């Protein structure tokens, strides 16, 4: 039997993210001192059936989720200071698929040299 995310629950999923990130804290918020600079935030919600080709891997979906937000910041001439992840997943998603998404997020954060901060 394949383990589903509904089998382990949200707390275990969050534990996986925290345990595998170099910069994340268990807080729900991140505070970045910015002095006289402007802090620009962005958040794009991507929907599997709308924003991803049917044959795109879960890893690539995670990578794209970071990339589209970095692109929005670049369009404004801003440098990303960190990435806040917001994800909605079906309760019957396989845990391995969830981990592939998150691994794609981690890889993109490494690629763009930005920490996953929450």
Stretches with model-predicted labels:
Residues 1-57, 76, 85, 107-109, ...:
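Extreme N-terminal cap/leader segments of soluble proteins
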Residues 22-23, 53-68, 92-103:
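Glycine-rich anion/phosphate-binding loops
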Residues 30-32, 67-71:
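Short amphipathic alpha-helices and their capping/turn segments at secondary-structure boundaries
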Residues 70-118:
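A glycine-rich phosphate/pyrophosphate-binding beta-strand-loop-alpha-helix module
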